[in-house]
Amino acid sequence: MVMEKYLLELGEDQVVDISDYTFAANFIWLGNVSGFYATIEDCFCLFAMSGSELSMLLPPLGKLKNLKKAINKCFEIMNSNNSSPHYSRIDYVAQCILEKFAKMLDKDASIFDVFADFIFEKKLVDYIYKADDLISLHGNAYHTKRTEINKFTNTYPNFKIVTLEPEKHAQEIITLSNTWVQNRLKYTPKEQMDDFMEGMYQEKAAIKRMLEYYQKLELMGIVLYIDERLQGYTVGEKINEGVASVLLEKTNFEVLGCAQFIFREFSKILSSQYSCEFINVGDDMGFENLKKVKMSYHPYRLNTKYSIYQKI
């Protein structure tokens, strides 16, 4: 695929393990976004249109030596289209790409030195864990997780995990997802409601797109049944040779321990199938409760993602 080709041109020593840098992730999550890609300075450049304003969903991907020239040209394109340069930005910029480019120019340079004409806004981080930690849950740090899983298996001995098959499970997955949103609305603070609903609108579209293109995107997923009723599902993919990612996960949060159990079991499957050392569960979308859950699994590292604006 075109995007993967340009990712490889970053170089073998520049492995990007952020969840946004795969075709599948962009395809399912951006199904409702108008946009286009272009080759600029021999880089893959992905643009999105919101209303009449143009922005970029990823930084230019390709040979690092072309990065800054491509960024400058992309801002020229956005500025010529937008009603104000303030709307022009590049999202989901991996810190590691910027740092590698800066060091290529000067081993002592920082990204802020090299990109002095730009404003960097730290937006989100990807949570990355050691697969073995998520599988073994060893030590006091994971005591609560082990307890929750034990309660689940003792309370629901009739659970069953099977491979996700969209033609069999699609309607049950959509029903569970809708129920999850309805239940979560009861606990969402009013000041977060607009952001929550926007996030859920995007996720609903992503779930439908995932189910429709599951096979073509070569995704992997499992569903969890209790007494013949679907109570959870999760879907992931391989990012690179060392890292797999979890793209989507939903469980009935009235079934205690269900989320912890399916996450551990899926971690086993991802590790076995892809021989990966790390598992990336994406970012927290800016939701504090999701941040707490992801931090409770003690990430091995947090990969920073920036939005970049041009100084005006």
Q: How would you describe each model-predicted region?
A:
Residues 22-100, 225-254:
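Conserved donor-binding loop and adjoining core beta-sheet/short helix segment
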Residues 77-130, 134-135:
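A basic- and aromatic-enriched beta-loop-alpha substructure that forms the phosphate/nucleotide-
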Residues 9-19, 179-188:
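Helix-loop element at the rim of GNAT/NAT acetyltransferase active sites that forms part
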Residues 97-118, 147, 285-302:
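Conserved active-site alpha-helix within GNAT-family acetyltransferase domains
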Residues 218-311:
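Aromatic (often tryptophan-rich) hydrophobic motifs at membrane interfaces
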Residues 88-89, 160-162, 277-281:
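Short catalytic-loop micro-motif centered on adjacent basic/acidic residues
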